[in-house]
Amino acid sequence: MGTGNDTTVVEFTLLGLSEDTTVCAILFLVFLGIYVVTLMGNISIIVLIRRSHHLHTPMYIFLCHLAFVDIGYSSSVTPVMLMSFLRKETSLPVAGCVAQLCSVVTFGTAECFLLAAMAYDRYVAICSPLLYSTCMSPGVCIILVGMSYLGGCVNAWTFIGCLLRLSFCGPNKVNHFFCDYSPLLKLACSHDFTFEIIPAISSGSIIVATVCVIAISYIYILITILKMHSTKGRHKAFSTCTSHLTAVTLFYGTITFIYVMPKSSYSTDQNKVVSVFYTVVIPMLNPLIYSLRNKEIKGALKRELRIKIFS
């Protein structure tokens, strides 16, 4: 972290979502409940897939890693946010703030890549079923998952590399509930446009690339489904994609609001609300989205419950 002539900032104070004690008490209970559901839902998905051998397929391997990423994503933000509801001020040392930003960006980026990998998996399964075992072999799955985490780490280090070159010598109050890059950038004493544009280009490139993979995959899927003569076949093919499409729409809808829309078109409070949705709410919703409409997941869950009850 760069130094200036004035006192160097050693910690950042997060202003959180609200200063009203009553509102904070209500929000604490709400988000504590959301976090518990997030952990239980995603851990259940991971355990269920690991224990059910018939779910050891590429689609569920990706879903298992998506659940892990959602746990990491939510855990990067929610515990600190919960503390902010119990205290008037929540302070994090500079190293803690850097670590939180690194974790959020890593897991958020990995989620983008995993959603793209899942779209490609659906494309191969529906458009080229005879080549599925070759195109989605265990080796290919390992590469796609590994690239997802590697992409997350590279993007995170882009943010951290720029952040560590900034000087913080004045105000230290971050108008957010976690150490996000944009609010931190506003507090920097040194104003270099390069440190603003590099993370934006990095994130923007990843969003565009993964959206293109998802869009192209679903265009081919739609064309293939429309060519099917059987109504039952169409319904079955489309039903395998609805959960993923729902998750993609929710995640990329909020990400687009934050990173694509002009910052002058929305306020800091709106930014906070949208950030809550994609860092806290979506990780809770994903297990529900992927399990409620999935017969294999529900079937595996029923079998596990029967084993527990009768054992």
Swiss-Prot record:
It holds the Pfam family 7tm_4. It is a multi-pass membrane protein. GO terms for cellular component: plasma membrane. The keyword Membrane applies. It is found in: Cell membrane. Residues 47-54, 121-139, 218-237, 293-311 are cytoplasmic. Expressed in the tongue. InterPro entries: GPCR_Rhodpsn, GPCR_Rhodpsn_7TM, Olfact_rcpt. One of its GO terms (molecular function) is olfactory receptor activity. This is Olfactory receptor 5P3. It comes from Homo sapiens (Human).
